[in-house]
C-alpha cells in the first residue's frame, strides 16, 4: 500500500502549491547503488528496469513531481535539493532510514495483516518490534474496507496502546475502471469496450492476495491466479507462460496491476489480451485531523 499512499500525498501537496520530490531506494533497479534522478518533474529520464518498478510508476503517474532513487538517500536527496529545489521531500519507505533527518514520520498498517505475528524478521514479517510504533507522528491504515468493523477496532486499540492522541487516518484502495494495456501505456484511463468475462490475474507483488481481492471487488471474475515474487522483473518466458495459461483456462484476458504493467513495456505481448487495473487510495476517516497535525508540525520544523 505504500505506492498508492505516496501518490495520494504527492497529489495533495502538489495541489497545495508545493514542489514535491520523492526519494526511494529503487529496490532491484539498476540505479539502486549509484543513485539517479528518475524524473525531474518535466521529463521521465529512466525506464522501469533502471529505476525500479515502484519509482518508475510514481514518475509515470505523478507529472510535475520529482522522483529520485538511490540506496544512499541522503546523498541523492542533497543532489535533488541542489539541482531541482523542491519545497517538500517525501521519503518512500523511510521509517528505518536513520541517516536522513525528517520532520514527520508516518507509519502505514495494512489492515489485512496489520501486525504479522508480532515478531520481526526472520521469525515474522515485521522489520522492527511493535514498540517502535511509538516513534510515529501519525498512523495510516490501508485497505480498511477489506476487514470487518471488529478488526478495525482491534487495530485502533493496538495503535492507541503504543501512542495515543496521534492522528489515525483510515484509507481504502479503490479499483478504477480496467483498461486495455495498450490504452494504459498511452496514458488513457477509460475503457470504452465491453470487458471480457473470463480473466486470469498475474502479479509480482508483496501481497498478491490483496490485489486479487481488489480485482474481485471491481466485479471481475478471475478463473486463475498467477503469482511471482515481489519486484520480479518479467521476462518473455513469463509472458508466454501467462498467455498460455490463460488460453488453456478459456480466459479472454490477463489483468495486472499498474506496478506490474510498467515492467511489461519492453516485452512482446498479445496486447489486446492484457488489461491493467488502476487503483487509487481514498481517505475515509480522519483526513482533516491528519493534515492539520502534519501541517502544524511541519510549520514548527520550518
Located regions from the model:
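Conserved lysine of the Walker
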Residues: 2
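Hydrophobic positions on the alpha1 helix immediately C-terminal to the Walker A/P-loop
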Residues: 5
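Post-Walker A helix-loop "phosphate-sensing" segment adjacent to the P-loop in P-loop NTPases
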Residues: 11-22
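Short, high-confidence coil segments that cap the C-terminus of an alpha-helix
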Residues: 18, 85-86, 249-252
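Short, polar loop motifs at secondary-structure junctions
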Residues: 25-27, 93-95, 208, 258-262
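Phosphate/Mg2+-binding loops and adjacent switch elements
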Residues: 26-163, 170
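C-terminal accessory "lid"/substrate-recognition subdomains
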Residues: 114-253, 300-302
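Short, flexible loop segments at boundaries between secondary-structure elements
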Residues: 174-178, 228-232, 271-302
Amino acid at each position: 500500500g505504500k505506492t498508492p499512499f505516496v501518490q495520494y500525498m504527492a497529489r495533495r501537496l502538489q495541489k497545495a502549491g508545493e514542489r514535491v520530490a520523492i526519494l526511494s531506494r529503487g529496490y532491484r533497479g539498476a540505479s539502486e547503488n549509484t543513485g539517479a534522478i528518475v524524473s525531474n518533474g518535466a521529463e521521465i529520464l529512466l525506464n522501469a528496469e533502471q529505476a525500479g518498478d515502484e519509482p518508475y510508476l510514481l514518475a509515470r503517474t505523478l507529472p510535475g513531481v520529482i522522483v529520485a532513487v538511490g540506496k544512499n538517500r541522503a546523498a541523492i536527496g542533497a543532489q535533488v535539493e541542489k539541482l531541482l529545489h523542491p519545497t517538500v521531500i517525501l521519503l518512500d519507505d523511510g521509517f528505518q532510514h536513520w541517516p536522513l533527518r525528517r520532520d514527520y514520520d508516518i507509519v502505514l498498517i495494512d489492515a489485512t495483516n496489520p501486525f504479522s505475528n508480532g515478531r520481526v524478521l526472520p521469525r515474522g514479517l515485521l522489520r522492527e518490534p511493535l514498540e517502535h510504533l511509538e516513534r510515529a507522528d501519525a498512523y495510516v491504515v490501508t485497505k480498511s474496507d477489506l476487514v470487518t468493523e471488529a478488526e478495525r477496532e482491534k487495530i485502533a486499540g493496538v495503535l492507541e496502546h503504543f501512542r495515543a492522541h496521534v492522528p489515525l487516518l483510515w484509507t481504502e484502495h479503490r479499483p478504477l475502471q480496467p483498461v486495455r494495456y495498450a490504452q494504459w501505456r498511452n496514458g488513457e484511463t477509460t475503457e470504452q469496450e465491453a470487458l471480457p468475462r473470463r480473466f486470469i490475474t498475474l502479479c509480482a507483488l508483496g501481497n498478491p492476495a490483496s490485489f486479487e481481492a481488489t480485482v474481485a471487488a471491481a466485479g471481475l471474475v478471475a478463473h486463475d491466479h498467477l503469482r511471482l515474487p515481489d519486484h520480479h522483473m518479467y521476462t518473455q518466458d513469463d509472458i508466454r507462460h501467462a498467455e498460455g495459461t490463460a488460453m488453456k483456462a478459456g480466459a479472454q484476458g490477463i489483468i495486472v496491476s499498474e506496478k506490474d504493467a510498467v515492467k511489461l513495456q519492453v516485452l512482446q505481448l498479445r496486447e489486446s489480451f492484457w488489461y491493467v487495473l488502476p487503483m487509487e487510495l481514498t481517505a475515509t476517516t480522519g483526513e482533516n485531523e491528519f493534515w492539520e497535525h502534519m501541517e502544524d508540525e511541519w510549520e514548527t520544523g520550518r
